[in-house]
Amino acid sequence: MKIITQILPLLIIGFTIILILLSIAWQRNHFMHASLTVVGLLLAIFSLFFVVHGSIANFTTLIHVDSFSIFYTGLVLIASLATSTLSYTWLSNNKDYKPDEFYILLLISTMGGILLTCAHHLTALFLGIELMSLPLLGMVGYTYRKKKVLEACIKYTIISSVASSFLLFGIALVYAVTGQLSFIGISNYALNEINYPLMLLAGLGMMIVGISFKLSLVPFHLWTPDIYQGAPTPVSTYLATVSKIAIFASLMRLFFYAPFNTHYEVKLLLCIIAICSMFIGNLMALSQNNLFRILGYSSTAHFGYLLVSWLVIQNVLVLETVGLYLFGYLLANLGVFGVISIMSNVSKKDTDLIGYYRGLFWYQPMLSVVMTVMMLSLAGIPMTLGFIGKFYIITLGINNNLKLLTILLLISTMISMLYYLRIVVSLYLYPAEKLHTNTYIQYNWALTSRGIMVLISSLLVLLLGLYPQPLINIVQWAQIINPR
């Protein structure tokens, strides 16, 4: 019974998928299936409270449930809930496509994300990535009659296949050397070996390449802005949050067990990727006028910052730092994509250009304030949650003598402020003449489910930025428990 309790979120999501499948066979009803999805995700979130009171459990050798996996499962479920909230209106506006199957794809992908957060074995890691990525192909290309959507789907299919190939070949090489696939078995080998064989280094390198594709790290990031721009807004939201947070959490556990970061070649590779991601991501974003492309390059920079944590992952402050940063990143992205979704709905077209938001404050002051808060949080401005996360990363770098990397991180952050503040300034400029007749002026967005989600996100970003102690307590609790 205790073991069943530990995997309760997975069971609830699985039951919801079966229920929606049977319901579709009986009758198609978009509202009912959207409601079932939301209810299933809410129940899965509430079930985490029962999981918290249970003991640490190994359901199989593949899955390990502890406070760390519970925390990141919560992040995955919250992001999936936000995605389903944004999806309802988008699917309702695209009446040429049957909407019901989208929710099945979303829930299956969410199961893959949950599996990743609990992964304790390279097999579970690979299965989780594939279970999350394959439904995403259908989600990206759901409105396939649109040229840019079809283009994004084809690109994502190719990139996902290449990334999986690198990852799988890397796993095979690691297994060939260590004879182990479990994180603990690999950890035992890594702790007992001083000089790693060339084949093991090659395997680790290929795994890092595969993961870098998934996390949009330089030089494997070029697909990101194209996919963000081409995919529907709710799917871009999911790509920016769930698909990256779940993979990063799983790799955090692997590197926490097996100290590969102490090896010179691995550390050098991670340093190069981190520095290139921070600078190239931010520099490329400077020249963009499309919000989706800016957010795509921005995500590359943010995960470049987070790579600093992998270099010193055995430090006691690392898990707390990453938890704070990713929670702030999640809320800010949900808020920004939520605002874009609200604007797109009323105009019945994509509002992804910065110029479209010029003077928004003069017609929708609350919406512009929400957008401002999210941009300031992404930039790491004080009094927002994003500042707390960035402060922790800088502290982590200084405390571990990564002074050069920390200085480069600060310079990169200052570069990022240029494009974040450019968006903020445009919100308060006097609007162009064509915006005087725009339909969104009278649109009461705050009473919609998306509006409520956006308001809650912005409120949390501000409150936790001013008083982060409740979140700090949670991330201090969400530690990896070594079962050895």
Swiss-Prot record:
Membrane-spanning ranges: 6-26, 36-56, 62-82, 99-119, 122-142, 166-186, 198-218, 238-258, 266-286, 299-319, 322-342, 369-389, 405-425, 452-472
GO BP annotations listed: ATP synthesis coupled electron transport
Topological type in the membrane: Multi-pass membrane protein
Enzyme class: translocase
Signal peptide segment: none
UniProt keyword Transport, yes or no: yes
Subcellular compartments: Cell membrane
GO cellular component entries: plasma membrane
Superkingdom per UniProt: Bacteria
Listed Pfam families: Proton_antipo_M
Major site of localization recorded for this protein: membrane
EC number: 7.1.1.-
Keywords: Cell membrane, Membrane, NAD, Quinone, Translocase, Transmembrane, Transmembrane helix, Transport, Ubiquinone
One GO molecular-function entry: NADH dehydrogenase (ubiquinone) activity
Keyword Repeat: no
Catalytic activity annotation: a quinone + NADH + 5 H(+)(in) = a quinol + NAD(+) + 4 H(+)(out)
PANTHER family to which the protein is assigned, alphabetical: NADH DEHYDROGENASE
Family: Belongs to the complex I subunit 2 family.
Assembly and binders: NDH-1 is composed of 14 different subunits. Subunits NuoA, H, J, K, L, M, N constitute the membrane sector of the complex.
Function, as annotated: NDH-1 shuttles electrons from NADH, via FMN and iron-sulfur (Fe-S) centers, to quinones in the respiratory chain. The immediate electron acceptor for the enzyme in this species is believed to be ubiquinone. Couples the redox reaction to proton translocation (for every two electrons transferred, four hydrogen ions are translocated across the cytoplasmic membrane), and thus conserves the redox energy in a proton gradient.
Protein name stated in the entry: NADH-quinone oxidoreductase subunit N
Source species of the chain: Baumannia cicadellinicola subsp. Homalodisca coagulata
Gene this chain is encoded by: nuoN
